[in-house]
């Protein structure tokens, strides 16, 4: 844009040359079409199609004459003739366009007079990335595509993990930083807002809707009211009753200092006392509720406590072979809870880590049929201190049990037994090989119980190896990108890696199916899920994190549910454990998917194991006999 007369003088001849070239290659209709498809009609409406939806809630072909004239009138100066802000001014401009149409013979005198007499009526529906379907996914995709090349000096000391992850993504993920890596013909970077790019994502709109509906049904309609009721009358609410009041006040004050209101008041020179007084003064505000936004009066400090009371969630579903991400939910509502718990946030994974431990065991010669005595296990930790994990399962105490039984029942003593036979460093290496980027996973003996933090997306990607013969596939969010003319600019293929042997993968499949059919994951069957599947629940200390990972031959999906902070949680496992808080979301989603025949998913689909495959081959029974033939049914029935 020319900023002064001299620049304008130089710009004019260039425009003349461009105009002549355009006229040579395109008709006037084509030129107008290209112009309207790129014009910014304000209010996030770039292009005539988006503008028609934004201002009149219809397709361009369905615009009435006076509506089309309104949009054309905006082209002279969209800010000056903005129909939302300046209705009468925009109406006047519309009538000028109608008059020009009359002069050109597109409408009759009578039509012109009648149309000019009409009021300007809008069906305004602003396009907002914070609303609609797949909001967390859209924002995640925007951040990935517009990411700049990582420069270490741009990251603070506590952001070195992020710098590490961003650097890997820049080098290995062609979608990461796409706008910075790809140039237009004029040498400038692409702009995802104004260049009319067509981005073809892997998200299935119906499956996405089913995922969001499942979250609302379980989290919004059932679990959240139960949580509110549990916290009624507690001075600490929403924090745990056992937490000292002083600690609760510290946490709320910390949250206050992270708000924009606090930052702006601080920048304006307000004292801590003045800021606190403002935060303790009631005011009108609109707040989130699962039944819709509600107007209320409360202090900003109370609003912080109010929003802390809402349980958060992360959910992702993907194809284990193609890597196509079908559904992506990062939280309850993007407008009010913008931190993405699908791909960005990490939480302790609890017992969902145990399949990695058992995989390491299978890779080191163990089999699902190997047995050990079900008793307490004591290991020496990294500090030379004895460590004995607690166990919620005292069934079959003192008996010989199989590893398959141990995983199916998520037994901590059996996990500790395996950890004693293996090496924590090797377990960390294996977890990283499954695509987990968190460098802060400590090689300690307690790692077998899942104290490390991993994202839902990383977990879902990792579990694809169990459904895909030992091959892990990275999440694929976009298949191709085209320019505004339909020219393909980039295509994206699945990124796959064999992380474990096919034999170990089959053995893990056998055990993870047993979690559902014989163990603690059986609750999923109550939802009408009869499919051949494997899975694993997870619950961390004090019910701070609830997990469920489940997979069928065609879909791998994972769900996490928890509070905004670890000290915000259910007091009872009845509601806070993975099988109660996270598993139902997975099950509700899958039931909706299976009930939609147009999606093509069938509960009759089975995992395919090689003919004659014996997961017990090479295993030793208590009397030392080596099992060479027969399968699990021979041993466990």
Question: Whereabouts are the PLM-identified features?
Answer:
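Conserved catalytic neighborhood of penicillin-recognizing serine enzymes
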Residues: 1-6, 58-61, 125-143, 366-427, ...
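Peptidoglycan glycan-strand catalytic modules in the bacterial/periplasmic cell-wall system
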Residues: 1-170, 179, 186, 333, ...
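Acidic/histidine-enriched alpha-helical segments
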Residues: 13, 49, 88-90, 94, ...
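Active-site loop and adjoining helix of the penicillin-binding protein/serine DD-peptidase-beta-lactamase fold
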Residues: 15, 19, 23, 75-93, ...
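Bacterial peptidoglycan biogenesis and beta-lactam-recognition machinery
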Residues: 23-28, 40-45, 59-61, 99-113, ...
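A penicillin-recognizing enzyme superfamily signal
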Residues: 201, 205-221, 252-319, 324, ...
